Amino acid sequence: MNEREVNEFLYKGADDLWAYDLWEKHENLHWLPREVPMKDDVYDWNSRLSEGDRMFLKGVMSFFTQADIEVHNTYIHEYLPYANTLGVSQMLTGFAARECIHVMGYAYGLEELVKGAEQDSVFRKWMVDDNLLKLHEALNKYKGSEDTEYRFKHMVATTLFGEGVMLFAQFAMLLNYARNGYMRGLGQIVSWSIRDEDYHVYGVTQLMKRDVMFRVHPQS
């Protein structure tokens, strides 16, 4: 190795170069919600969607806004204490920061589509809808455990289920609107979110496969 290669090897993290590379690729895909024009979505919302469609989209965007706040918090407060290499720390903090973009994206959609006093009630919908509330409680149940090993294993399983199976199922339903010529701005936000979540699920899966984070006790 030449001097530059040695320095890169050291600052990227000798043990977890894959995580540094994943972080860099993920950062190259950075985006902001306000890059997406919503004018046509507003027209669709007011003139083309049924009341049932609007109710469905309100529920999904309300839950996604809150759920991604909690995903961000999970990366910061639950995962990072286990990360003891620079590459893994960078990857996880990058994932957490992108979840804030997702929060902003769904909130931006709601702000553009729902106006007046109704907006606040929609943002709080997940707190009063029985199905959304039960899902919220189920995804956070492990956080009440004092058993560190149980907490860690369920944290990983919940992340892979929440960021993988559950999110992608709802993404498919949302993208169906754009596929049929409706809500294309929202569809763009969802498409970029899917691209991000591919990296997030892959990164967490690699942490498990490579035994990086199966150190039951967090770093002090």
What are these regions (language model features)?
Residues 1-220:
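Non-heme di-metal
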